[in-house]
Curated annotation (Swiss-Prot):
HAMAP family: PurU. Gene3D superfamilies: 3.30.70.260, Formyl transferase, N-terminal domain. Its EC number is 3.5.1.10. InterPro entries: ACT-like_dom_sf (IPR045865), ACT_dom (IPR002912), Formyl-FH4-Hydrolase_C (IPR041729), Formyl_transf_N (IPR002376), Formyl_transf_N_sf (IPR036477), PurU (IPR004810), PurU_ACT (IPR044074). PANTHER family: FORMYLTETRAHYDROFOLATE DEFORMYLASE (PTHR42706), FORMYLTETRAHYDROFOLATE DEFORMYLASE 2, MITOCHONDRIAL (PTHR42706:SF1). This is Formyltetrahydrofolate deformylase. It comes from Corynebacterium sp. (strain P-1). Residues 8-88 form the ACT domain. GO terms for biological process: 'de novo' IMP biosynthetic process; one-carbon metabolic process. Belongs to the PurU family. It is an enzyme of class 3 (hydrolase).
Length: 286
């Protein structure tokens, strides 16, 4: 028996009759077995979102052959699509400032095999976490940033992304506002964790804002970056119940776990091809 290999096909396109039939028919013709199929038909937008995890016998140049032949199906239905091997690790560059809990969580999950990622570097505007990062055998890049040096620092970040081949950038409590230019360059391939349940309490010190309002839940939001501060399409959110006895620092401590969980979920779903961007929204086929 030949070795079995698995692939994941993701697509979105205008809704219409026969799309799913065309996709499954393609898989049947190539003797592929569907392991998981998830779809969402957004009736209001008139758009279909589809993710198929399928398996079959290995063959030389199989992925290229599948891509070449599926392109004909895709063209017929005006599909925006991607086909890749399942389990292929996504190259990730992490950016961080002073707070290290999200960084530690991502590095541990990578090391334990919980996340399908390869961290190709960590960049920070502070030198604090060099020893932690290098313990994992990962390159640490200290890129100081100030108002005067921001254009030069952001150019260095873009160069680092290019040099490392990073496919995804993760802002793991990176406490610098990206310029419109950098945010535009990274649109759709950068995930930020905001320590608030957006759209509430944007900007700095959201836990202090939450305490002033007497909230009964605090949370965290992982979202794609765009040119608007904390306004990018939301991927994942987590909440923690609190009460009137929690002070601002208690809320900060309570929120850290939710930040780690929301960010790791967002990274996982992105790397598994479960997140679809459409306008300022996402569809997540979990």
């Amino acid at each position: 028996m030949s070795e079995q290999v698995r692939h994941v096909l993701t697509l979105q396109c205008p809704e219409g009759i026969g799309i799913v039939h065309a996709v499954t028919g393609f898989l049947v013709r190539h003797q592929r077995t569907i392991v998981e199929l998830k779809q969402y038909d957004d009736m209001s937008a008139g758009r279909l979102f589809l993710r198929v995890d399928f398996a079959g016998d290995s063959a030389p140049d199989l992925l290229d052959a599948l891509r070449s032949e599926f392109s004909e199906v895709a063209a017929k239905f005006d599909m925006d699509w991607q086909l890749r091997e399942r389990g292929q690790k996504t190259k990730v560059l992490i950016m961080v400032s002073k707070f290290e809990h999200c960084l530690q969580d991502l590095l541990f999950r990578m090391h334990s095999g919980d996340l399908p990622i390869e961290v190709v570097g960590v960049a920070s505007n502070h030198p604090d976490h060099r020893s932690l990062v290098e313990w994992y055998g990962i390159g640490f890049h200290h890129i100081p940033i100030s108002k005067d040096t921001k254009p030069r620092a952001e150019a260095a970040l873009l160069e680092l992304i290019d040099q490392t081949g990073a496919e995804l950038v993760v802002l793991a409590r990176y406490m610098q506002v990206l310029s419109d230019h950098l945010a535009s360059e990274l649109t759709g391939k950068t995930i930020n964790i905001h320590h608030s349940f957006l759209p509430s309490f944007k900007g700095a010190k959201p836990y202090h804002q939450a305490w002033e309002r007497g909230v009964k839940t605090v949370g965290a939001t992982a979202h794609y970056v765009n040119s608007e501060l904390d306004e990018g399409p939301i991927i994942a959110q987590q909440v923690v119940e609190v009460d009137h006895t929690y002070g601002p620092q208690d809320l900060v401590a309570a929120g850290r776990d939710s930040e780690c969980k929301a960010l790791s979920n967002a990274v996982r779903w992105h790397c598994e091809g479960r997140v679809f961007l459409y306008g300022n929204r996402t569809v997540v086929l979990r």
